[in-house]
Structures are given as structure tokens and as C-alpha cells.
A protein has these predicted regions:
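Loop-to-transmembrane helix boundary motifs in multi-pass membrane proteins
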Residues: 13-14, 21, 137-142, 265-271, ...
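Hydrophobic alpha-helical segments of multi-pass membrane transport proteins
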Residues: 327-333, 354-368, 372, 391-425
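Transmembrane helix-boundary motif of multi-pass solute transporters/channels
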Residues: 10-48, 241, 257-260, 264-267
Length: 466
């Protein structure tokens, strides 16, 4: 069932909510690492080209599909072609899997924010602090529950009064915090015991200057795949979120303009995240100090904050507050997608479905927390990495399902339904879709090929073939 009046009030509300979904912890803990690893400005250039081509195609497809059908992913694909009903069910699985662990990560962020509020944070910078926390029995569950309760409360309030209102308040604050921390990072300097001086501006050069040293065709393809995977996960596509948010967009909204603004917003935040983190890590830990994922946020950066001296604690508080905003906006979008799909599937009101999804999220998140102690195991994944329960959920959703869903969606839109179906929705109010020709070419030929390659690489099939 679709709620009466379940829609964003206008274009701004939609853009801020969608950008909030796209701007998650992945933008902040993965984008800077890939920049440092993949040639700085070279990676930035490749990423920007992909945003303007590949990114806009996937984003436009999801949003237009949602608005045209006024349905969530579970029913939207079925309304296009009953034979493709299964694609809606596959898409529904992605947020269902992501929801199992996203509130756990949100709880980690809440814990570090609380630590810096009540202390100078020196414990957080010590070796083994993060491992000790996530392997404990009670603390991770408590902080996860706090984060999950806040997420559920926002979703419970509905689209306009909950998600849109929250996004209008939080997103400007998130951007302001990122800009302030980024500017501060550029002013930093540090002298090692051997007299070597490193500055934030030198770190900025590491970030922006293209590094072509040792570049080969194989190396460029690796950079291309890294940029593609980052873009793919950054824009919240192929997980039903943008289809759901698209179904809340009013018909009079200029869809082309709105999706362009989301692209700019998401790319801008990713760029600022790199400017915020790379110079700071470079100053205190050197060029080889960059890490990815939880290691960057919860191990490397606390050491950087500790090395800042008197400025470390306020910067850490601002940083983890900003991280909390980013995690919360993304988690809200994941939970809203589950709630909206369940409302449509079971024909129950928001309050009941929010309660049901909340219970599901709590139970599964507790299991993820226990995956670091009582239920700990190590499993070698098909892509060669080794992980435990959280990593398995992340792998299935991000590395397996999302590329596969994008591949199938491009085939459905490009060859079964036809690109003009999406283009017609974008031009619903007489707007000119300037990139219509590019969209046709990309959705038919480029997206299927690239998504197939990404799927084969991320699932390990490429290594088996070679």
C-alpha cells in the first residue's frame, strides 16, 4: 500500500534526502584511501568522467523508474514486465542485507563520539582499543541500539515529516563540518624525530597531483575498476533506495536537474572527504599511513587526532559528529526502503511495518555484533578476501547482488523496455534531456559490459577464467 501524501514537498527535499543516502560512510572511509592508492589526481579524473557518464545513467534509471511507476522496487520491475518480477525481489534483498550491519557501524561511530565527549581520547588512539571494543559483549550492542532507535524514529515519522525534515536540517550541517575540518587539515604541519617536515598543503598535492609513475594498461584498468566500484556503491543505486525515493517525487519536479544536483552533491562531498583526510593523515603518518574502511576511521585517525595536541579533541568531536550524520542519513534511506517495500507487499500501515523492520534490524544487528566474539569465524570469500559475519553480508550485497542487479536492469531498460521509456519520464514536463543520446548508448552497450566485468572481478570469477 502507498501512503496518502507520501511524497517529498519539492525538488530540494528530494535532492537533500537522496544526497543524504548517497553520502554515507563509504564516501568518507573509502574514497580518500582509493585516491591515495590510485595516483591521486589520476583517480579523481577517472572518477569524475565516470560520474558524468556511468553514474548519471544508473541514477537516472532508478529515479525515473520510481517516479513513473509510483511503486517501490519490489513492484516497479513487475509493472514494467511481469517476467522480470524476480528482479524486484533481488533488489529487495540488498537493503535487507545492508540493514543487518549498517546500524552496527553507526554504533561504532556513536561510541567514538561519546569517548571524545567524556575524555581526551588518548585511549581511543591506543593500540588495540578498537579491537577491544568490537569484541566486547555489551558495549557494541548498546551503542548499536541507540543508533538504530534514532534511525527508526525518523523513518516512523514518514517521508515529509521524518526523512525530508531530518535531511533539511542535517545535510547543511554535515557539509559545514566537512568544509571546516578540510580547511583545518590544510593548515597542519608536523616535524618527525629525524627533522622531516610535512605540511597539509603537501598532503593536498599528494591528493590532487596525478601520479603516472609505473602506469601500465593493467594498472589503469585496476584504477578504472576501483573508481567504478566506488561510484557504484556511492550513489545508492541498484539497491532499491533511489527507486523508492523516486516514487516519492512529484510529477512537476524537473527530474534531470534533480539527478544532476545529486551527482554534484555526492561527488563534492567525496572530494571534500579526501581533502579532509589525506592531508591530515599525510602530515602525521606519512604517505604510507592511509588505510581503508574501519582501520582508517577507528585506528589511523584517532592517532592523528592525538598527534594534533590541544586541537585533537575538538576536531575529533566534530569529525565523529559529521560521520554520525553521514551514517544516519544513509541508514534512514536503507530502513525506509525496507519499510516502504513491506508496506506494499503486506498492505500494512507504516507504524506496523516500521515496528516489524525495527525488530528484524535489531535481531540481525545483535547477531552481527556477536560475530566479533561469540559467533566469530573467518571465511575466505570468492574475491580473495577473508572476513567474518559482517564482511559476508557486505560481500553478498555489495560485491555480488548490486553489480548483478545493475547488469539485469540495463538489459531490461536497454533491450526489453527500451531507453525511450526512461527518457520520456525525464522529459515529462517538456524539459530537454541534453544527455539523452548518451543515455541510450550507455544503457544499451556500456553499462551491461562494464557491469559484467565488475561482477566477474568482484566475485572472483575473473581470476578463475584467467
Amino acid at each position: 500500500m502507498k501512503e496518502k501524501g507520501s511524497s517529498f514537498s519539492g525538488s530540494i527535499g528530494f535532492v537533500l534526502a537522496a544526497a543524504g543516502s548517497a553520502v554515507g560512510v563509504g564516501n568518507i572511509w573509502r574514497f580518500p584511501y582509493l585516491c591515495a592508492k590510485d595516483g591521486g589526481g589520476l583517480f579523481l579524473l577517472v572518477y569524475l568522467v565516470l560520474v558524468l557518464t556511468f553514474g548519471f545513467v544508473l541514477l537516472t534509471t532508478d529515479v525515473a523508474l520510481g517516479r513513473k511507476t509510483k511503486k517501490n522496487a519490489l513492484r516497479a520491475f513487475e509493472s514494467l514486465n511481469p517476467k522480470w518480477k524476480f528482479l524486484g525481489h533481488l533488489t529487495f534483498l540488498v537493503p535487507a542485507l545492508i540493514m543487518t550491519y549498517y546500524s552496527v557501524i553507526g554504533g561504532w561511530i556513536a561510541k567514538y563520539f561519546f569517548t571524545y565527549i567524556i575524555s581526551d581520547g588518548k585511549d581511543a588512539a591506543s593500540d588495540g582499543y578498537f579491537t577491544s571494543f568490537i569484541t566486547s559483549d555489551i558495549a557494541p550492542v548498546v551503542f548499536m541500539m541507540i543508533f538504530l532507535a534514532l534511525t527508526a524514529w525518523i523513518v516512523f515519522r514518514g517521508v515529509e515529516k521524518g526523512i525530508e525534515k531530518f535531511s533539511r536540517i542535517i545535510m547543511p550541517g554535515l557539509i559545514l563540518l566537512i568544509v571546516i575540518i578540510a580547511i583545518f587539515s590544510l593548515t597542519l604541519s608536523h616535524t618527525d624525530t629525524d627533522g622531516t617536515v610535512r605540511t597539509g598543503m603537501q598532503g593536498l598535492a599528494v591528493y590532487l597531483k596525478p601520479d603516472f609513475h609505473g602506469l601500465t594498461v593493467k594498472r589503469f584498468l585496476e584504477i578504472l575498476l576501483d573508481a567504478m566500484s566506488q561510484l557504484f556503491f556511492s550513489l545508492s543505486v541498484s539497491m532499491g533506495i533511489m527507486i523508492t525515493y523516486g516514487s516519492y517525487v512529484k510529477n512537476e519536479v524537473n527530474l534531470n536537474k534533480a539527478t544532476n544536483q545529486i551527482e554534484i552533491f555526492d561527488t563534492g562531498v567525496a572530494f571534500l572527504a579526501g581533502m579532509m583526510i589525506i592531508p591530515a593523515v599525510f602530515v602525521f603518518l606519512g604517505k604510507d599511513g592511509m588505510a581503508s574502511g574501519p582501520s582508517l576511521i577507528f585506528i589511523s585517525l584517532p592517532k592523528v587526532f592525538d598527534a594534533m595536541g590541544v586541537f585533537g579533541r575538538p576536531v575529533a568531536i566534530a569529525f565523529f559528529l559529521m560521520m554520525g550524520f553521514a551514517a544516519l542519513t544513509s541508514c534512514v534511506s536503507v530502513m525506509e526502503t525496507l519499510v516502504a517495500n513491506c508496506m506494499e507487499l503486506y498492505h500494512k500501515p507504516r507504524k506496523k511495518m516500521c515496528g516489524a523492520v525495527g525488530i528484524y534490524s535489531l535481531v540481525t544487528a545483535v547477531l552481527i555484533c556477536l560475530g566479533y566474539n561469540k559467533l566469530y569465524f573467518e571465511l575466505k570469500l570468492p574475491n580473495g578476501s577473508v572476513g567474518q559475519l559482517l564482511d559476508v553480508m557486505d560481500y553478498i550485497s555489495n560485491s555480488f547482488l548490486m553489480p548483478f542487479i545493475s547488469l539485469l536492469t540495463s538489459i531490461l531498460i536497454g533491450w526489453v523496455i527500451g531507453p525511450d521509456w526512461i527518457i520520456g519520464e525525464v522529459e515529462r514536463n517538456g524539459e530537454h534531456f541534453k544527455r539523452a543520446g548518451l543515455y541510450r548508448f550507455m544503457i544499451r552497450y556500456v553499462v551491461p559490459v562494464v557491469m559484467l566485468i565488475l561482477f566477474l572481478v568482484s566475485t572472483g570469477f575473473a581470476d578463475l577464467i584467467s
